[in-house]
Amino acid sequence: MGDNIVINLNNVSRSYGNVKVIEKLNFTINKGTINSLIGSSGSGKTTILKTILGKLKQDDGIVQVFGKEPCGKGSEIPGSSVGYAPQDVCLYNEITIEETLSFFASIHRMPKDEYIKKRDSLVEILELPSLSKIISELSGGQQRRVSLATALIHSPKLLILDEPTVGVCPLVSSKIWEHLIFLTKNFGVTIIITTHYLQECRSCDNIFLLRNGRILESGPPNYLLSKYECSLLEDVYYKLCRGDEEISLQLIDSKNNEKINRDINTSIPLEFISNGANINNDDILISNTNKPIIKKDAKIYKERLSDFKNKLQIWFSHSITISIRKLTQMYRLKFPLVFEIISPSLLITLFFLAIGNVPHDLKFGIKNIDSGSLSGDFINALSDGNNIFNFIQINDTSNAIQMIESSDLWGLIDIPVNFTNGMINKLFNPLEKSFENSEMEIYMDLSNFQMNLMVDVQFQKAFNKIANDSGIKLLPTNFHAVYGDQNANFNWFLAPAMICIITYVHCMNFLSITFVREKNDGTRDRILLYGVSPVSNVLGHILAHIPILLVQFSIQLLIAVFAFGVPIKGNIVLIYLFFILINTVGMCQGILISLISKAEVDAVQLCLAIFICSLCMAGIIWPTEAIITFGWISNLVPTKWSGLALRGIMIKDLPFSHQHIWKSLIIIISYIIGTFSLIVISTPIGDRNFNFKKLFKRIKK
């Protein structure tokens, strides 16, 4: 009997919060039978299917499929032993029918000739439209048939079909049922379906009638019709629901609140086990046995798991398959693809145009009543070779101050009488003369720190130029450039890190939205159910995104170098290496964000929060050395290290042996390993919707 049992549920319960969805459920399903779960919405059908598939963890009881707990050691679930067609079609809208079937065949590692043979057979049975049609162009019924084809393509031992014939014409529905019966009779395939069309269930070997998470009755259709003296299964279900409702009312009205044993005796008289109306119900056995059945015939699966080399090959094969599918999806969406490639370049161009440049055309008032030439030389030095200042002659100081207050002027330079003589006396006879008339008065709006700093620098440069032209050295210092250039501008500092963070957040946002969509539309869980590991799924998306990253980065570098003069002095290979690594961190963080986000807007908001934190704490626009109180936080931001390394390579030509380079590389790789590990730990299908209340109860015990 153990070899014949495919599914065994023993006292299984499952809750969502305080609501019991299924309670003390007991049933077994035998090999080579078609079994139908019948019940209204909320009766627990989908929860039972998800528990069997390992997508939900039961609160209590034992669930065994092929003799093992789903997702447990040695289990065939997840894997290719099961075929699943969910109620939501869970297909990729951007690819064709052929690409869809080929993708799932590759996931199951089917030989090409076997795939073609099975594909052609399913096209005929399910009457699929042209294989070149894109999924989004199909009707709902056509999409459901394609979904069913993906569940059948690899010839699984267990088929779980949720509403497989909804929206399908009666003729095709009849052919589907004929094929399902053929599979059970000739290949011993076990099938579980849910449906609202009770008359379809006349072809089933077994029917389970559910209400409020309990089995009201089960058995072959003719047995149920005979037992309850009905001509239609709808009438049988109606009688059972009415009886169950009356028992519930009696229980509520009972003063003693006596517990009523409502377990159904599902043993069936032998005369109903084989009958003409039930097409293929040979050797059906319904049992509520509590004895765990352990199937020992899992040799091939155990050998594959124990062979690490083969496991790596499977991971690699799945990763390549997913990356090809993802690239195909992106290629089909032309506008999003172009936007994905161009938008970082547009942002970096906007950044270069708006940030880091020296201001120009600043209106400054000049009140110059100096009789000497030094004041004129100073004004000429300020205007020499640039258009930073736009000088306006002013005669009245108070009037100029009013213009500054009304924002008509940035400032006023008030040069006193005999300024030239005063400066000469200050420099050459400091003890003989006072410093009167040796200082000019500057009136400015000092609320703009950055602008004040730039103006101050220009004034100092002008005085140094006058002094140097006269052979006088004002400052007792000589600056020598060990790295960089004295003519470097602020963009040299900003560009390497800014290019990084733009693409970093772009990748994070793109991957988080992608994974939230795949999580919500069911496509992610579907491939995980077929044995695709979280490692392969993540690697597949990362591999698909790397070609786009390389194009993005190349365009940004060309813009930075040829349009805005940012130098690249170091090893270009190291530059690309750090760029790919930091964006891999961004992609992994995006996937991690998707695991805790219910909707795309949640993921976008989290990405925006990380972007703001990185912009402020990573030393991108201001040195991290200026962060005094919480400076240690900047060490936790990965873009700090990529910016540090890229500045070192691009501007300083630092070798790999320099501590800024190899330390940054180790830290970024550690981030990748850490986030990747969190994804792998958090994603496994068996841990979804885990009941933490039960876990805490066990801890207390």
Curated annotation (Swiss-Prot):
This is ABC transporter G family member 23. GO terms for biological process: sorocarp development. SMART domains: AAA. The keyword Disulfide bond does not apply. Keywords: ATP-binding, Membrane, Nucleotide-binding, Transmembrane, Transmembrane helix, Transport. Belongs to the ABC transporter superfamily. ABCG family. GO terms for molecular function: ABC-type transporter activity; ATP binding; ATP hydrolysis activity. Its main location: membrane. It is found in: Membrane. InterPro entries: AAA+_ATPase, ABC2_TM, ABC_transporter-like_ATP-bd, ABC_transporter-like_CS, P-loop_NTPase. Disulfide bonds: none annotated. It is a multi-pass membrane protein. Residues 7-237 form the ABC transporter domain.
